[in-house]
C-alpha cells in the first residue's frame, strides 16, 4: 500500500475508528473514506476525524485526529441491524438534541416508534440533524482545543461520555456504547441539575426520552469507587498546577442547546448523582 492508495472503512464505529487510525499512521498519513453501516457510526463515529483503538486501561486512549476525505451514509445499510444496535446509535442522536438541537428531542418524544424504524422519514430527519450538529461543531474545533475553563468547544460532543467510558471499561465492553452513554447522560443531567440549574422538567425528560426508545437509564452491578478510578483517565481531565492533582471536567447543560463545563465537582456530589442513576 502506497501513499497514493485509499483505505475504506466499511462497517460500524469500531471499524471506522481502526481504519482511520491506520490511515493516520501508515506512512504518516494516507487517504481514508468511511462507509458507516450502523446508526452510531453514521451519527457520530465516522464523522469528525477522531480515530482510535481501545486498550485494557480504557477506551480510545490510543488514537489520532485524522479527517476522512469522504463519508458515505446510506440508510439502506441499516435495515439488517438488530434492534439493540439501532437503539444504541440513537443515544448519540439524543445527545445531539440535548447539546445543540432540541428539535431532535421533540421529534423523538412525539413518535418514538417512528424513530426506531430506520426506514421512516422521522428517523432520517433526526439522523440528518445529528450529523449536522456533529459536523458543525467539528468544523470549528477539529482538534478539541477551544475548550478552556468553563467554555466548551468540541468537548460538548462528550456529553454523558465521562461516565459512559468508565462503564464500558468496567463492563469489559459488553455494553454497547450508546447504552453506556444513555446512563452517562442521566448522570450528566443530574450533575447539571445540581450545578447548572437544569430544570426538574428536563431532568425527568432525559429519563423519559431514553427509556422510551429502549435505552437503559440505570446501571447495576457497578460500584461508584471502581468507576471513579477509571474516570481519572478521562481525556477531559486536567492537572491542577498548584496541587498536582487530576481534576475532572464534565460537560453539562443549563437547558437543551446551552452547554457549560462543570469543573472539579465535589466528590460527594458525584457519588450522590451516580446513586440516582444506579439500579435499585
Language-model-detected regions and their locations in the chain:
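A glycine/threonine-rich phosphate-anchoring loop and its flanking beta-alpha core
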Residues: 20-114
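C-terminal charged capping/lid subdomain of soluble metabolic enzymes
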Residues: 85, 91-93, 197-280
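N-terminal small/polar loop signature for handling phosphorylated ligands or for N-terminal nucleophile
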Residues: 1-33
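Active-site segments that bind and position negatively charged phosphate/pyrophosphate groups
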Residues: 115-226
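Short alpha-helical scaffolding segments that buttress acidic/His motifs in well-ordered protein cores
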Residues: 90-94, 108, 126-134, 185, ...
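Solvent-exposed alpha-helices and their adjacent loops that cap or buttress functional pockets
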Residues: 1-2, 25-27, 54-55, 62-66, ...
Amino acid at each position: 500500500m502506497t501513499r497514493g492508495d485509499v483505505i475504506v472503512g466499511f462497517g460500524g464505529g469500531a471499524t471506522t475508528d481502526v481504519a482511520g487510525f491506520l490511515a493516520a499512521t501508515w506512512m504518516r498519513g494516507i487517504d481514508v473514506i468511511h462507509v458507516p453501516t450502523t446508526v452510531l457510526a453514521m451519527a457520530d463515529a465516522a464523522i469528525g476525524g477522531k480515530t482510535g483503538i481501545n486498550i485494557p486501561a480504557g477506551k480510545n486512549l490510543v488514537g489520532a485526529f485524522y479527517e476522512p476525505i469522504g463519508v458515505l451514509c446510506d440508510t439502506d445499510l441499516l435495515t439488517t441491524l438488530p434492534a439493540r444496535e439501532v437503539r444504541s446509535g440513537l443515544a448519540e442522536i439524543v445527545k445531539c438534541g440535548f447539546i445543540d438541537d432540541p428539535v431532535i428531542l421533540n421529534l423523538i418524544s412525539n413518535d418514538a416508534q417512528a424513530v426506531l424504524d430506520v426506514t421512516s422519514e422521522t428517523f432520517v430527519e433526526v439522523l440528518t440533524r445529528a450529523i449536522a450538529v456533529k459536523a458543525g461543531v467539528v468544523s470549528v474545533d477539529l482538534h478539541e482545543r477551544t475548550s478552556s475553563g468553563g467554555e466548551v468547544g468540541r468537548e460538548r460532543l462528550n456529553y454523558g461520555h465521562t461516565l459512559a467510558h468508565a462503564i464500558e471499561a468496567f463492563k469489559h465492553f459488553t455494553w454497547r456504547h450508546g447504552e453506556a452513554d444513555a446512563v452517562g447522560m442521566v448522570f450528566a443531567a443530574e450533575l447539571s441539575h445540581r450545578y447548572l440549574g437544569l430544570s426538574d422538567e428536563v431532568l425527568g425528560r432525559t429519563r423519559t426520552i431514553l427509556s422510551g426508545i429502549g435505552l437503559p437509564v440505570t446501571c447495576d452491578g457497578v460500584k461508584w469507587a471502581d468507576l471513579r478510578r477509571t474516570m481519572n483517565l478521562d481525556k477531559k481531565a486536567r492537572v491542577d498546577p498548584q496541587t498536582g492533582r487530576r481534576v475532572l471536567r464534565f460537560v453539562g447543560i443549563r437547558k437543551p442547546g446551552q452547554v457549560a463545563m462543570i469543573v472539579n465537582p465535589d466528590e460527594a456530589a458525584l457519588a450522590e448523582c451516580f446513586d440516582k442513576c444506579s439500579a435499585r
